[in-house]
Each structure stands twice: as C-alpha cells, then as structure tokens.
Swiss-Prot record:
The gene is gluQ. Pfam families: tRNA-synt_1c. Coiled coil: none annotated. A motif ('KMSKS' region) lies at residues 237-241. GO terms for biological process: glutamyl-tRNA aminoacylation; tRNA modification. Binds 1 zinc ion per subunit. Its EC number is 6.1.1.-. Its cofactor is Zn(2+). NCBIfam families: PRK05710.1-3, queuosine_YadB. This is Glutamyl-Q tRNA(Asp) synthetase. Zn(2+) binds at residues 100, 102, 122, 126. L-glutamate binds at residues 8-12, 44, 181, 199.
Amino acid sequence: MAIAPRGRFAPTPSGDLHLGSLVAAVGSYLHVRSQCGTWLLRIDDLDAPRVVPGASDRIQTCLEAFGLHWDEVVYFQQPQQEHYQAALEQLTATGRVYRCQCSRKQLSQSGDSVSVDGSLRYPGFCRDRQLSSEIEGSDRLNVQNLPAIALEDAWQGRYQQDLAQAVGDFILRRRDRLFSYHLATVVDDARQGITEVIRGLDLLASTPRQIALQQLLNLPTPHYGHLPLVVWPNGDKLSKQTKAPPLDLRQAPALLSQAIGHLGLAMPSDLQGAPVGEQLAWAIAHFPAPRLSKQPDSLS
C-alpha cells in the first residue's frame, strides 16, 4: 500500500515571513495537499542566537492568515537535542567523525577553493590529526571516498555532487556545541516521517550532504523538489538580509495570489484576490504547473 505523502515547512524564527518564505510554504503545502497528504510545521529554532523573541508565534499567525493550516502539533528543534546526539554518536561509530580546531579565519587564509554553496571547501587540515574529543573544536564528517550523491529533483531534474570535491568534510556539531542544520534536518525529517521536502532552490546544493547522512544513518531519503527563488530585480534573493519586507496580513488575499503566480499557476482573474480558502482550493486542484520555470522569478 502506498504511503500517504508527508511534507513540512520549516522556517527559522529569526524574523517575520516575507514573500519568498510564502512561496516556499505555499509550494510545499500545495504539493502534499494535491496528493491528499499531511502538511506539518516545524520551527527550526536550533540556532538559539538567531532566534528572535515572538517570531515563532508570528510565523504561526501568519500561516493561518493565509489559510495554510498544518496537521499535528508544531515541532520545535530545541527539545530534540538527545536525538541529534544519538545520531552523532552513531556516525562517530563509523569512524568518519573527527574533531577539528580550524577557525574561520584560518580557513579564509588557506586559499582553498570555494564550495558549491559559497563557503570555503574544507581542505582537511585536521582529518588525520586524531585530536581528542576533549579538545575544544567542531566535529566534522570525513566524506573522502564516499560515492557521488545523485538525486532526481521534482523540478530541477537530475543533480549530482561529489562531496569531497564540492564541499569537503562538513560540520556536524559546531565549536559552540550547537548541532548543524544538516544533521538536525535529517534527524527531524526521519522522526516526523517526512516523504516530501519542497523548499527553495538555494538549498539544492546542500541536499547531497543530507542524503549522505541519511545513508550513513540508515534513514529513508525523501523525495526532493526545489522551487525557483523569488529575487529582487537585481537578482538578489528575497531574504531578511536583503531587507525583504514582512508580509502584510491585511493584504493576505492579494499576496497569496502573487505567491501562487510565482509557482507558475495562472489563476482565473475572478479568483485573483479572492478569499484565501477559495484560492488554495483552486491551486490544490491545479498543482503542479505544467511548466514551472527553473529560473529565479524576479519581483516586479
């Protein structure tokens, strides 16, 4: 018997949602609802220094204003530390985890190449030093000799990456003892039974790292789909860093119409700006768009 799809929207509570966030949320919502699946809300509050007080509550209020009602209870990362620790111990038992003392300054001065996500590719300075776990530092995963990771993305097609060449050994737990986004995401997706990960194109390059962790931890790999980003006219991604304005809940119907349009759906003119429930019902019945662009969609 086929497993009912389970998707999720997992914002970081570092501020309010903006149009780019809304497009990602609506895309993941429509993807699972169009298959009669379950849609979950996860608050990625693991990185405590980035959490803005009250942002989690505002995110939930915002989603409800747009008719994006989630199933089950909201899942928070902060209470899941023991599960991340267990996963790290399981990875350590494979012999692929090592302590690293390299600072960002050292790496920036190393002259090594830039990785696929814009950060520096780790050159492996500490890989063979066999540093004690009692020494202050981060924990990295040795990706040398791992097979290339390939996936079939729902919208971007086939994507392949050799982790050793593309990113190098990556961090599982930071120097400040916070678990990494990649490790936490993999553990959370498995614990929540996520089968569909629909998110922005900026996260495609990080997906092979997550698949590698799933394979090493013997966890299932979800289906992935990476949506084209919403960008400013100059090509910069809409984000908190580029001053994307927070969503105005008073304009929810108009903004939802805009988000649905960014997903390639040509909604009838009489539904433009209609109550959010009516718009979502139509979009669920017509998702996905026959030809969703792979390119970023500029904000007009």
